[in-house]
UniProtKB/Swiss-Prot annotation:
It comes from Dictyostelium discoideum. This is 14-3-3-like protein. Pfam families: 14-3-3 (PF00244). GO terms for cellular component: cell cortex; centrosome; cytoplasm; cytosol; extracellular matrix; nucleus; phagocytic vesicle. Belongs to the 14-3-3 family. One of its GO terms (biological process) is microtubule cytoskeleton organization. It comes from the Eukaryota. The gene is fttB. One of its GO terms (molecular function) is myosin II heavy chain binding. PROSITE patterns: 1433_1, 1433_2.
Length: 252
C-alpha cells in the first residue's frame, strides 16, 4: 500500500476503534523514514495511546483487586491474579518496546523541525515512563533514567523552539511533571515544573493562535488541576510525616 493508503486505513481503523490495526498502518508510514505530517504524527500517537491506554487501565484494575485479595489473605486468588498481571505486563512491555524502536530507528532521526523533535522525544519519555510504572528493581531504575533523559532532551528543544503557549510544549510540561511526581516521587520538582509552565503560558496568552487555543487552554487546566492536587498532598505530608503515603492519581 502507498503512504496515502496506509494513512486512510489508519483513519478507518480509528473510526472502527480497531487500534491495533491503526498502529500497524501508521508503523508502515513511520518506517518510510520521512518527516511525518502533523496529521500523520497525531494518528500515530493516537493509535499507540489507545493500545497502551487499555492495558494501563487493565493493570491498575488488576493491581487494585490484588491488594484487596492480599488484605483478605486469599492466597489462591492472589496467585491467579499475579499470573494474570504478568500477562498484561508482557503486553505493556511489548507495546512500549515497539513504539520506542520506531521512534529511535525512524522518527527521531527523520525529524527536521523543532516541533516534531519535541513531539517524538516527549513520546519517548512517555513510553519509558509507562514501563517504569509497573517495573520493579533495576528495570524500573533503567526505564526511569531513560524517560528522564528523553524528557530533558524534549525540554531543551522546546524552550528554544516553541512558545510557552504551544500545546506540544505544554503537553510535555504536563507529562514531565507527572513523571517527577509519580515515578521519581519528587512532588516539589513536579509542582515547580507545572507552575513554571502554567505561569509562562499565562504571561503570553495574548499570543495564542486561534488554531491551538482549545488544546493549549485544556492542557493549562490540567496543569492547574495537578498543581492543586499536588500542593495539597505536599501540605498534608508536611503536616503528618508519619501518615499514609497513598497518592491520588493526577489528572492527565
Amino acid at each position: 500500500m502507498t503512504r496515502e493508503e496506509n494513512v486512510y486505513m489508519a483513519k478507518l481503523a480509528e473510526q472502527a476503534e480497531r487500534y491495533e490495526e491503526m498502529v500497524e498502518a501508521m508503523k508502515k508510514v513511520a518506517e518510510l523514514d520521512v518527516e511525518l505530517t502533523v496529521e500523520e504524527r497525531n494518528l500515530l500517537s493516537v493509535a499507540y495511546k489507545n493500545v497502551i491506554g487499555a492495558r494501563r487501565a487493565s493493570w491498575r484494575i488488576i493491581s487494585s483487586i490484588e491488594q484487596k485479595e492480599e488484605s483478605k489473605g486469599n492466597e489462591n486468588h492472589v496467585k491467579k491474579i499475579k499470573e494474570y498481571k504478568c500477562k498484561v505486563e508482557k503486553e505493556l512491555t511489548d507495546i512500549c518496546n515497539d513504539i520506542l524502536e520506531v521512534l529511535e530507528s525512524h522518527l527521531i532521526v527523520s525529524s527536521a523541525s523543532g516541533e516534531s523533535k519535541v513531539f517524538y522525544y516527549k513520546m519517548k519519555g512517555d513510553y519509558f515512563r509507562y514501563l517504569a510504572e509497573f517495573a520493579t528493581g533495576n528495570p524500573r531504575k533503567t526505564s526511569a533514567e531513560s524517560s528522564l533523559i528523553a524528557y530533558k532532551a524534549a525540554s531543551d528543544i522546546a524552550v528554544t523552539e516553541l512558545p510557552p503557549t504551544h500545546p506540544i510544549r505544554l503537553g510535555l510540561a504536563l507529562n514531565f511533571s507527572v513523571f517527577y511526581y509519580e515515578i521519581l516521587n519528587s512532588p516539589d520538582r513536579a509542582c515547580n515544573l507545572a507552575k513554571t509552565a502554567f505561569d509562562d503560558a499565562i504571561a503570553e496568552l495574548d499570543t495564542l493562535s486561534e488554531d491551538s487555543y482549545k488544546d493549549s487552554t485544556l492542557i493549562m487546566q490540567l496543569l492547574r488541576d495537578n498543581l492543586t492536587l499536588w500542593t495539597s498532598d505536599v501540605h498534608n505530608m508536611e503536616k503528618n510525616q508519619d501518615g499514609d503515603d497513598d497518592q491520588n492519581e493526577p489528572g492527565m
